[in-house]
């Protein structure tokens, strides 16, 4: 691979300390998968669905009863 010439020439000191500036770089982390629905929300939805099913069954039971039993 051919080296690219830059307009700045590297200078290393013969004596003294050599310091280098640390440049922060981006570090890509593994993505975290988050659930679309929380466990609590799923439990609440299940409870609501069960309650609606019970109400629907009770309404069907009332419709199937003969009229004489409804009057009591």
Swiss-Prot record:
Organism of this sequence: Danio rerio (Zebrafish)
Annotated function: Required for primary cilia assembly.
Description of the deletion phenotype: Embryos display defective melanosome transport and disruption of the ciliated Kupffer's vesicle phenotypes. BBIP1 morpholino knockdown results in bilateral cystic dilations of the pronephros. Pronephric cilia of morphants are abnormally short and fail to maintain a parallel orientation to the anteroposterior axis of the duct. Morphants also show increased frequency of situs inversus compared to wild-type and abnormal retinal development.
Compartments it resides in: Cell projection, Cilium; Cytoplasm
Major place of residence: other
Protein keywords: Cell projection, Cilium, Cytoplasm
GO biological process, one term: melanosome transport
A GO cellular component entry from the record: BBSome
InterPro entries xref list: BBIP10
Family: Belongs to the BBIP10 family.
Protein name: BBSome-interacting protein 1
Name of the gene: bbip1
Remarks, miscellaneous: BBIP10 interacts genetically with BBS1.
